[in-house]
Amino acid sequence: MGSGIAQVFARSGYDVILVDVSEDILRRALQSIESGPYGLIRLVEKGKMSEEEMKKCMQRIKTSTSYESLKDVDFLIECVPENLELKRKVFAELDKICKKEAIFASNTSGIMISSLAVAVERKDKFIGMHWFNPAPVMRLIEVVRGAMTSEETFQITMELSRKLGKVPIPVNDGPGFFTTRFITAWLMEAIRLYELGIAGIKEIDEMCKLAFGFPMGPFELMDLIGLDTILHIAEYMYEETKEKHYAPSPTLKKLVFSGYLGDKRSKLGSKGGWYDFFQVKK
């Protein structure tokens, strides 16, 4: 997700510093931005961008494995895995490094913003900015105000989202916000229907697309997002709400524990997703 967000910012004329834990991951991120399924080369091929514009766009993106490279940024977006303690640790370290004026935004898909903001001093400059996959294509950004998010931080984030060509919609803080609460229940129910033998993976995907006009079905969507991410979200939602429709599916756990983390093109080290594990032809 981070590489897609970086692509959106760079294409909108912003200088970007992309930070990750290894040079190999960063190399793959740049490769995805340039030649991935939603990359810049595709835009050139479709006539939506010139080769010169693509070159300038790529030049706006710098990479680093050090948090020190972020010390002068104005706006920071965190995209680490959906793990509360990991996110808090990252923000606590960044809070010591980044200038005090910098706004911190989390791309968490469901962890309460107020529970993340406890890790930093700048609670008034902390906000949720929930993007959707694939970031270069999906227009919605869910903007989440924490308990101490200032009006200025909120307005800056809303306006920035619009400048990026996105549609920001404000929501209140709570486990899963709106979209994740809604979609997690849908995804877990789709898996349960498969487990009950009501319909197959491909058939469920096709019915959701044909009946509801969705661009992709639940199993295709889970493969795109990442099955490990979906599992983390479901576990968090169930732990926070104790509502049974969020309970993680045993089948989902089996795939994740077997190394099937989703689409191999976007998930480093994954053996594949639902269609690969069950050998279903698309």
Each language-model region and where it sits:
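A non-catalytic, amphipathic alpha-helix used as a structural packing/dimerization or gating element
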Residues: D24-S35, L86, E152-K163, E203-E206, ...
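A general alpha-helix detector
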Residues: G39, R139-L140, W186-A190, G217, ...
